[in-house]
């Protein structure tokens, strides 16, 4: 009868929850599994959010079941609807990099930090490894894109950042996108922390349009929390996304993206550190 069916469904659900926790699943990963039609995340206040998927935004084109790690630990995609490439994200924190070994390890491209705006002083700073990394990557037939960590407060500062980046990349053959990196500074205050979603979106658009006008492909780097809470995604539909999402077998992001950063602790021959 109906009551028996309800009790059976309840027992099945409780058994699922118990088995997931016994196997080490986190509360968040379990909630994501239980609510497949929502975007589940934890906001900056520490509260769980169950957001509806926005039908106005282009959906991801990738088959989640087609993602897998190969014998080298690198993420691969076997879907027939796209050809994928393996890349690494580098900054001065990686110290010495042997790009010949990196190329031999199967890396197709490198996203290299060219600089940043200091989150306290607001000064524009070049990454001290940018020139060396870029020169040696290109020398070893690794395609290069760049990213810049933004702390712009308005359109004018965003354009200033973009023009600074264009000056830095001018000597090089940059074949991959130029990304604006927007994310929070953990455990410290930072210039952009009080910007509204509308204001930060203005910053991103101003940066991207300046990059695009110079003949490069703009890209927006961020994580799930920032894409959901800190920008107006509908206004950013015309720009490619570089999604950072870790500890999942496939990207936990329902919307269209061009690049996925799937770990912050990866290792590859030729690079010291993560």
Regions found by a protein language model. Give the residues of each.
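Mixed-charge, low-complexity intrinsically disordered regions
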Residues: 4-8
